Amino acid sequence: MSKPLPLVTRQGDRIAIVSGLRTPFAKQATAYHGVPAVDLGKIVVSELLARSGVAPELIDQLVFGQVVQMPEAPNIAREIVLGTGMSVHTDAYSVSRACATSFQAVANVAESIIAGSVTVAIAGGADSSSVLPIGVSKALARTLVDVNKARTLSQRLKLFSRLKLRDLLPVAPAVAEYSTGLRMGDTAEQMAKTYGISRQDQDALALRSHQMAAQAWQQGLLHDEVMTAYIPPFSDAITEDNNIRKDSTMEQYAKLRPAFDRKHGSVTAANSTPLTDGAAAVMMMSESKAKELGLQPLGYLRSFAFSAIDVWQDMLLGPSYATPLALDRAGITLADLTLIDMHEAFAAQTLANLKMFASDSFAREKLGRSQAIGEVDMSKFNVLGGSIAYGHPFAATGARMITQTLNELRRRGGGLGLTTACAAGGLGAAMIVEVE
């Protein structure tokens, strides 16, 4: 076990998260069709600033992420600063840790506050699966470079004449791991088979996610943390997530065919998170700065941890590796948690991680620990639903989970919450948040 690692400044200040906000999340090619991630980021940060009452010139830094990169805006963070009326002197840089990107943004801001180089900052992420960087073939790309260096028209025409018709076809972004060629769904299928996770259990978790998310919206629990987003030319607005199935049944889920292993698989579109557009952000500062500004923090960041594992087998087990570290650094156990929010990339991945949390053999063989961190009390788990229901704009999910968990802890009178996620490349993230 690791020793506790308090997240405090030299003056003993804790890291306060004073506010959090997100856009409604929308399925690919629906409400945000044609709206790039950078615009979604501007929308949410502008509204976060307006609601916070914090003067824009007080923001020292903005750390933001985007997984599906757009060549025309490689530093999304700086574009958001320049497009939201913030001071041009506000520092800004972008990060990417796949599905854990906004976890990384929050961690970076926390470390800067601890170091004393930043007092007030914004962290978050945005992604669009509707506005994609459609590329060209390698042959055409190479030819275009050569054409740019050619001196005469005849040289240019000769270069183009070597191309074949297929070289002119557009190339969609890759959906597989660069290093292995495996899709996320392939790994989810492998984990379902390895750990004996049935199709019925996957469908049941997906149904639970949608039911709880629908209930959260019906009870008005999300209204304060989800803004109304107006879509250019601003005649239309989206007020709620549009992926949530409010009246689905197990019978409907059972009718769907497997999406990856067509013959023997159990992972379907219904028990997986969909491609999604959206943005989310949190405002962070030192505890003393929050007091100085008269702000009541949503809560505090108690600890965080990241992990990296093999990409060929069990690539989505990141939460099972990162969570024990985050618990140790916070000086607590799984039983001390009031809430647990785990990113549901796939129902199979989620259920596999829950099994590993409770597995003594996994703890001994993979983590070098004497025993498992424990079995998860499902009454604490994803109590407002998860990513299968809300959707998953890759870089925004972490900020959504943190904000959602803090608000729910406040409704329950305080406590400790775990937010954790798997990520492409065998990465994992876990954060412990606290509300008094």
Curated annotation (Swiss-Prot):
CDD domains: thiolase. It is found in: Cytoplasm. GO terms for biological process: fatty acid beta-oxidation. The keyword Zinc does not apply. Keywords: Acyltransferase, Cytoplasm, Fatty acid metabolism, Lipid degradation, Lipid metabolism, Transferase. Its EC number is 2.3.1.16. One of its GO terms (molecular function) is acetyl-CoA C-acyltransferase activity. It is an enzyme of class 2 (transferase). Its main location: cytoplasm. It catalyses: an acyl-CoA + acetyl-CoA = a 3-oxoacyl-CoA + CoA. The active site is at residues 99, 392, 422. One of its GO terms (cellular component) is cytosol. Pathway: Lipid metabolism; fatty acid beta-oxidation. Heterotetramer of two alpha chains (FadJ) and two beta chains (FadI). Catalyzes the final step of fatty acid oxidation in which acetyl-CoA is released and the CoA ester of a fatty acid two carbons shorter is formed. HAMAP family: FadI. Belongs to the thiolase-like superfamily. Thiolase family. This is 3-ketoacyl-CoA thiolase.
